[in-house]
């Protein structure tokens, strides 16, 4: 700063030789700085207005022509701009369709914060309230310690002025003695803040996990609902940041409030001892603080929206990374690294642009904030400290003839000045933390919006209420699905039968509808009795796999009725096996009994010898010979495609359900092993519902369900010619 001042002085001296006074130069310099600040603040607003008007103007255009400046830009900039437009379009679409409230300091924020507070602190007497009580006690103790330390420092200066070595040494010992509890309390405040943050996060994580796995929400959120794009990011990063912000804000708001209240009382008492007016100083400080706070609130950027958008773009970047990891083999086969890297760069550039916007907004806001806090408030503090000395009733030294008494009064005034200065520094620090907390509260509003919004979506999807953005523009007038407030209503019913004599599955006028509300089959009515082995055929996209999702309860039923047997103890009604089976984290035993646990296996009295027999049925006994049942491996990479499919069949033989939903589950298995598997399944009394393109499996079924891809279907008994054809091909 001194170097800059010297540089300005030299320029001013040169200007004086040309007829400009130093005062005029300083005035011009300050005016230029204020003008630059005004331009910097107003330009983003003007750009925002122009962008909004241009979007409205171009909304009706359909030709999609590019401006000359866009044509002349580089390909990378053009693609980045297109990605930005797509992102803005998606956000506008979500606002228009879902009536979303923008994150900010509003009633919705208070409502969401209250909801999350009830989750973090579920009752009056719990672990979290205990932490809060101890934390609050430490904060109050720290305030009293600050006041006591300020008084000790004032006494130290007093005895230095008096040259009283004995009293100085005594007060200095007290000062060193108070340092031990003061440092302990400071450390405890940080420790309790961390513990409080972890406790809040644990409560939120447990509650959100409970919702996430309720009624298969983990599937519904990503496949049936379109409001949450990256649930994993919200469940991990957003909850963590929200919990940290709440715990930190409690300290940032509570401690300054205690400081201001107690320090204000201490200053008023000191002014009273100096026989000065105790109202003028506090009134002046309150007025200055209120005025500066109002100005900062007016010019404060919308940090809540900015932070929420930053978290959204960061979550999308993580999503791109995870997608590349998941599909690494396919990308490598296609040689699509250039496309993936380009998408990754675009996602990262969007995040960088948003972070740069936040940095730019913070630059000028923090500059103005520091001007008020460091200089305006410091000047006000100087006036507050000087008023009791200048306006006190006994301020003149010349009226007192006794030199000793005069020196005593000088030392007392010095003590007051030192104590008041230290207290004012603490008070200014408290006010600065309160003002800085406003930005943190606005940022907290963004994370509150995301976390509370996630839980609201979880609760709605658990009740069967879904919202897909692509549904809003089409399929709302199909006459089959009823919509309410832009959301499809599942009016169909699932009826569970407890009659042991009625173990059939029946669909009565049930439409096959995709998550986007596309009608695949308008009405499907059929009855599948035990022993009716059903073969399902038809072209791609005709509704074969969709039927399995409806039977399994993954997709909602928008009309009609689905009658299924109620699962009894240890005997599931249906067991679905996809073409690409899922291999869980665990041992070989865990792969066979999934989704059972070892405790479930022991309760069913199933031994390892029975598991070996099951592996032998699917020709996987060599795996048990190579590895024990307790060895934990990455089975997804160890097993081949055919071995994974046979492992899924082993799960079927372990659980022995009434009905097996087989979706191309043996496409990578040899024909002889496949035939053996189907024979064993029928011998166990499992009714087979099979989707396959292999005619060799026809002979294991009694009925056929044919879809034509146009919404029509036919359910009939398989004739002898079709059975003979299957036997001939096998």
UniProtKB/Swiss-Prot annotation:
It comes from the Eukaryota. InterPro entries: AAA+_ATPase, ABC1_TM_dom, ABC1_TM_sf, ABC_transporter-like_ATP-bd, ABC_transporter-like_CS, ABC_transporter_sub-D, P-loop_NTPase. Pfam families: ABC_membrane_2, ABC_tran. The keyword Transmembrane helix applies. Disruption phenotype: RNAi-mediated knockdown survives to adulthood, but suffer from neurodegeneration including age-dependent retinal disorganization with retinal holes and pigment cell loss. RNAi-mediated knockdown in the neurons results in a similar phenotype. Effects are probably due to elevated levels of very long chain fatty acids (VLCFAs). In contrast, glial-specific RNAi-mediated knockdown results in no defect. Residues 136-373 form the ABC transmembrane type-1 domain. It is found in: Peroxisome membrane. Its EC number is 7.6.2.4. PANTHER family: ATP-BINDING CASSETTE SUB-FAMILY D MEMBER 1, ATP-BINDING CASSETTE, SUB-FAMILY D MEMBER. This is ATP-binding cassette sub-family D member 1. It comes from Drosophila melanogaster. The gene is Abcd1.
């Amino acid at each position: 700063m001194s170097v800059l001042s010297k540089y300005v002085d030299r320029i001013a001296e040169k200007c004086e030789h040309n007829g400009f006074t130093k005062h005029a130069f300083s005035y011009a310099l300050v005016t230029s700085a204020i003008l630059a600040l005004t331009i910097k603040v107003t330009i983003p607003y003007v750009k925002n207005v122009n962008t909004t008007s241009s979007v409205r103007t171009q909304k009706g255009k359909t030709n999609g022509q590019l401006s000359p400046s866009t044509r002349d830009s580089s390909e990378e900039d053009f693609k980045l701009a297109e990605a930005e437009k797509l992102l803005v379009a998606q956000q506008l679409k979500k606002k228009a369709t879902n009536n979303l409230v923008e994150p900010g300091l509003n009633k919705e924020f208070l409502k969401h914060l209250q909801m999350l507070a009830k989750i973090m602190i579920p009752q009056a007497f719990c672990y979290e309230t205990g932490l809060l009580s101890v934390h609050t006690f430490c904060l109050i103790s720290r305030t009293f310690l600050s006041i006591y330390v300020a008084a000790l420092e004032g006494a130290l200066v007093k005895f230095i002025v008096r040259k009283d070595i004995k009293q100085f040494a005594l007060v200095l010992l007290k000062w060193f003695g108070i340092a031990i509890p003061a440092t302990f309390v400071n450390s405890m405040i940080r420790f309790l803040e961390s513990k409080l943050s972890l406790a809040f996060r644990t409560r939120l994580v447990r509650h959100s996990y409970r919702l996430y796995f309720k009624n298969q929400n983990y599937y519904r959120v990503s496949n049936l609902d379109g409001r949450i794009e990256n649930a994993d990011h919200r469940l991990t990063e957003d909850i963590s940041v929200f919990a940290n912000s709440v715990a930190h804000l409690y300290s940032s708001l509570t401690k300054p409030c205690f400081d201001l209240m107690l320090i204000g009382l201490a200053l008023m008492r000191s002014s009273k001892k100096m026989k000065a007016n105790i109202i003028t100083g506090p009134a002046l400080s309150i007025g200055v603080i209120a005025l500066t706070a109002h100005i900062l609130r007016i010019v404060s950027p919308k940090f809540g929206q900015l932070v929420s958008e930053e978290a959204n773009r960061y979550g999308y970047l993580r999503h791109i990374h995870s997608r590349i990891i998941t599909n690494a083999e396919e990308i490598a086969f296609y040689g699509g690294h250039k496309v993936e890297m380009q998408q990754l760069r675009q996602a990262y550039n969007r995040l960088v642009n948003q972070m740069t916007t936040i940095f730019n907004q913070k630059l000028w806001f923090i500059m103005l904030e520091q001007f008020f806090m460091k200089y305006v408030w410091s000047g006000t503090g100087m006036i507050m400290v000087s008023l009791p000395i200048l306006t006190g009733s006994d301020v003149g030294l010349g009226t007192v003839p006794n030199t000793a008494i005069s020196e005593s009064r000088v030392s007392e005034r010095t003590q007051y000045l030192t104590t008041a200065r230290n207290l004012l520094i603490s008070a200014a620090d408290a006010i600065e933390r309160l003002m800085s907390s406003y930005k943190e509260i606005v940022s907290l509003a963004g994370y509150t919006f995301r976390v509370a919004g996630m839980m609201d979506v979880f609760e709605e999807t658990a009740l069967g209420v879904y919202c897909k953005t692509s549904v809003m523009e089409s399929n709302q007038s199909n006459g089959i699905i009823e919509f309410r407030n832009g959301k499809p209503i599942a009016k169909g019913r699932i009826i569970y039968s407890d009659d042991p004599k009625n173990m059939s599955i029946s669909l009565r006028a049930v439409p096959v509808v995709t998550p986007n509300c596309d009608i695949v089959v308008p009405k499907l009515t059929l009855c599948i009795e035990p022993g009716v082995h059903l073969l399902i055929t038809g072209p791609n996209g005709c509704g074969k796999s969709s039927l399995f999702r409806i039977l399994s309860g993954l997709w909602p039923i928008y009309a009609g009725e689905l009658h299924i047997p109620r699962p009894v103890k240890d005997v599931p009604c249906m067991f679905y096996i996809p073409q690409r089976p899922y291999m869980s984290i665990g041992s070989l035993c865990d792969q066979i009994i999934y989704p059972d646990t070892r405790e479930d296996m022991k309760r069913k009295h199933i031994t390892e010898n029975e598991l070996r027999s099951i592996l032998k049925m699917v020709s996987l006994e060599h795996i048990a010979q190579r590895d024990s049942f307790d060895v934990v491996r990455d089975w997804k990479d160890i097993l081949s495609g055919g071995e994974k499919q046979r492992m899924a069949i082993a799960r079927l033989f372990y659980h022995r359900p009434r009905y097996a939903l087989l979706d191309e589950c043996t496409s990578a298995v040899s024909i002889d092993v496949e035939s053996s598997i189907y024979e064993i399944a029928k011998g166990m009394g499992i009714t087979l519902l099979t989707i396959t393109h292999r005619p060799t499996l026809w002979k294991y079924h009694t009925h056929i369900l044919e879809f034509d891809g146009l919404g029509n279907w036919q359910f009939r008994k398989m004739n002898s010619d079709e059975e003979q054809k299957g036997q001939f091909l096998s």
